[in-house]
Amino acid sequence: AGKSTASILDATQPTNRVIVTWHDGVKQGRPFRWASTEANLSSAQKSCFNIKPDSATTADCASNTSTDKLGEDRLNYIRGERGKELSSGGTFRNRQSRQGDIVNSNVWYVGAPVSNYAFKGYSKFTLDNKKRLPIIYVGGNDGMLHGFSTVDGSEKIAYIPRGTIPNLTRLTWPSFDDNHRYFVDGSPMTGDVDVSDRSSTKYTPDWRTMLVGTLGGGGKGYFVLDVTKPEADFTESKAASLVVMDQTLHSS
């Protein structure tokens, strides 16, 4: 039998994972890594990671008065670091795997483009991407949408939606397993879209494969990722173009 995506992820160095998120300040995709500045997360988002989680933790980070300075450790825990878990002498929840449980999110497969559109430029788009690396996408209750290679099962991309950030600290809570909550619980789907300006008859088609994901039971929100070229674009340096948008209830 082949290895599971969880076992492959557990054998991966957390620092090598490509994980991106949405920066509320600049309103763009950014690497999900701690920084002393607001380069990757806004100050409000960073404050969410300094919350001590318990049964009273709310999604409004500002209303939580029990805080500490373990934000960087919590973010690294979410990335997969295990050195602060209880079994290692730390205070964070023990995990059986870095990959969280998947409950209601259905797997979505994306290989070569297969739609038979007769629109301008689409046939070239299909030819250009006929050898595209096949990826399966699925949401998890570790706070991420995952993209796994169907070739070897390795994680190629993970996305943390803005709507999950206020509650991510709960994943470090030792009592989380008895107080489970959903995060990225919705099912992703994709479609091929011409994103060019078609107001001119001389426009140049710009076809992309766009993924739409939702939080499902994890909240009211959706996000859009450009998953056209996994091998070229699934890097943290391209987070700004990879994440097209991320909207939650009452967000701007």
Show which residues each predicted segment covers.
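A fold-level detector for beta-propeller and closely related beta-sheet-rich head/sensor domains
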Residues: 1-252
